[in-house]
């Protein structure tokens, strides 16, 4: 559910904060009301993965149009999106381009087979001389602040990690209170209690870091440092917490009847 909210948000916020007035009037109303449109962004590439400064997808100006060519992968909800925000290299800088569904040259590939997050469909995407109006360049002549877009996605994904970790912690904590071994709940065992304490500490620390980064984003401050630190810490935290949750549940942690396995 969180990813289904995040995907359109990574289109809405760049247009809201950096788009031209014409782009805001044309596209933002579609994200509310009865005529809601799905949207997603396309950054990751097969060759360079998540490297926004080495994009092989190109955009060249041709008269009153931009022509985009390249390949993207791991694009969430691409088959259902009415609007895509595609990032491409233009004269050495990374810029965003708004592409509407059905634009000639925009091709959506087969659904990828994910190991996890199976509720979120991801696809490959091809741009074959995809021609869009010149005014669909995000921000118009001014362009977009790519660092700010990346920082916002980092903060959002890290907040999701906090949510995943908290759910795993609460489930394993409640299980430890109920599971009795050798005449007492395993939560009373020091080894389990230490695990739960460390999990709680790391979750709260990450949440506070996420709040600080989000607060600075709302104030339109540079959050490159905070977002980078947060992403690194959140990644390690969520792996540790979910792993400990599986350990606390023992054999039950490997069974899908319990959500920590997922």
Named regions from a protein language model:
Residues 1-7:
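Short, flexible active-site-proximal loops enriched in glycine and acidic residues
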Residues 3, 18-23, 33-34, 52, ...:
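Alpha-helical interface subdomain recognition
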Residues 9-18:
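Helix-loop "lid/cap" segments that line or gate small-molecule binding pockets
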Residues 34-44:
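A short, Trp-centered hydrophobic/proline-enriched beta-strand micro-motif
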Residues 51-53, 77-81, 118-120:
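Short glycine/proline-enriched turns and hinge-like loops at secondary-structure junctions
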Residues 54, 102-134:
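Flexible, small-/acidic-enriched active-site or ligand-binding loops
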Residues 64, 123-148:
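A short, charged helix-loop
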Residues 69-108:
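A short core secondary-structure module
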């Amino acid at each position: 559910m969180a990813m289904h909210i995040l995907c359109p948000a990574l289109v809405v916020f760049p247009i809201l904060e950096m788009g031209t007035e014409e782009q805001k009037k044309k596209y933002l109303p579609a994200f509310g009301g009865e005529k809601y449109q799905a949207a997603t962004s396309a950054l990751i590439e097969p060759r360079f993965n998540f490297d926004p400064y080495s994009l092989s997808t190109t955009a060249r100006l041709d008269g009153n149009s931009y022509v985009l060519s390249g390949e993207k992968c791991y694009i969430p909800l691409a088959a259902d999106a009415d609007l895509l925000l595609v990032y491409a290299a233009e004269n050495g800088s990374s810029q965003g381009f708004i592409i509407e569904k059905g634009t000639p040259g925009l091709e959506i590939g087969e659904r990828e087979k994910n190991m996890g997050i199976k509720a979120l469909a991801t696809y490959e995407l091809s741009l074959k001389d995809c021609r869009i109006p010149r005014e669909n360049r995000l921000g118009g002549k001014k362009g977009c602040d790519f660092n700010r877009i990346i920082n916002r996605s980092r903060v959002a994904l890290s907040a999701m990690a906090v949510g995943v970790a908290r759910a795993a912690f609460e489930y394993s904590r409640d299980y430890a209170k109920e599971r009795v071994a050798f005449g007492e709940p395993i939560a009373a065992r020091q080894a389990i209690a230490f695990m739960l304490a460390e999990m709680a500490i790391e979750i709260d620390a990450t949440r506070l870091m996420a709040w600080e980064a989000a607060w600075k984003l709302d104030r339109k401050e540079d959050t490159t440092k905070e977002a980078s630190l947060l992403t690194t810490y959140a990644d390690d935290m969520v792996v540790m917490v979910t792993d400990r949750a599986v350990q606390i549940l023992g054999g039950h942690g490997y069974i899908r009847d319990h959500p920590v396995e997922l």
